[in-house]
Amino acid sequence: MARVSGVDIPREKRVEVALTYVFGIGRTLSQKTLAETGVNPNTRVRDLSEEELVRIREYVDNNFKTEGDLRREVQADIRRKVEIGCYQGLRHRRGLPVHGQRTSTNARTRKGPRRAIAGKKKPGKK
């Protein structure tokens, strides 16, 4: 199994798609990597030579932040915003959407499941 930045990339997929399994590499960076290293994007990972894999691995490691480093950087950015008390930090702290989305309706993913306030009313005696 081919490894790039500590991630096993799937052997059956095209290289262009397989590289996107690495956190921090999307479609565009994948295409850029393959263009710079001179690898055909339509090649399957299983058909890559060892030399091509080494070129891809070195290019990714030298030019992009991926996996653990990138995750740590994102967490540090969020932590910094929370500490300085800016608006985005407050939204993170409260568990609400950060980028200006509406919250009157929707935003269920960020807010979590609904919590009933009083529960169902029982039918009263008449």
UniProtKB/Swiss-Prot annotation:
Family matches, as Pfam families? Ribosomal_S13
**Has the keyword Ribonucleoprotein been applied to this entry?**
yes
Where do the record's region annotations for Disordered lie? Answer: 94-126
The record's PROSITE patterns line, in alphabetical order, gives: RIBOSOMAL_S13_1, RIBOSOMAL_S13_2
Biased composition, class Basic residues, residue ranges: 108-126
Q: Entry's InterPro entries?
A: Rbsml_uS13_C (IPR027437), Ribosomal_uS13 (IPR001892), Ribosomal_uS13-like_H2TH (IPR010979), Ribosomal_uS13_bac-type (IPR019980), Ribosomal_uS13_CS (IPR018269)
Which cellular components does GO assign to this protein?
A: cytosol; small ribosomal subunit
Entry keyword rRNA-binding: yes
Keyword vocabulary terms for this entry: Ribonucleoprotein, Ribosomal protein, RNA-binding, rRNA-binding, tRNA-binding
Gene Ontology MF term list: rRNA binding; structural constituent of ribosome; tRNA binding
An annotated GO BP: translation
| Residue stretches in coiled coil | none
Q: What does this protein do?
A: Located at the top of the head of the 30S subunit, it contacts several helices of the 16S rRNA. In the 70S ribosome it contacts the 23S rRNA (bridge B1a) and protein L5 of the 50S subunit (bridge B1b), connecting the 2 subunits; these bridges are implicated in subunit movement. Contacts the tRNAs in the A and P-sites.
Give the record's subunit note: Part of the 30S ribosomal subunit. Forms a loose heterodimer with protein S19. Forms two bridges to the 50S subunit in the 70S ribosome.
Tell me the protein family, please.
Belongs to the universal ribosomal protein uS13 family.
> Would you tell me the protein name for this molecule?
Small ribosomal subunit protein uS13
Q: What is the lineage of its organism?
A: Bacteria, Bacillati, Actinomycetota, Actinomycetes, Kitasatosporales
Gene giving rise to this polypeptide: rpsM
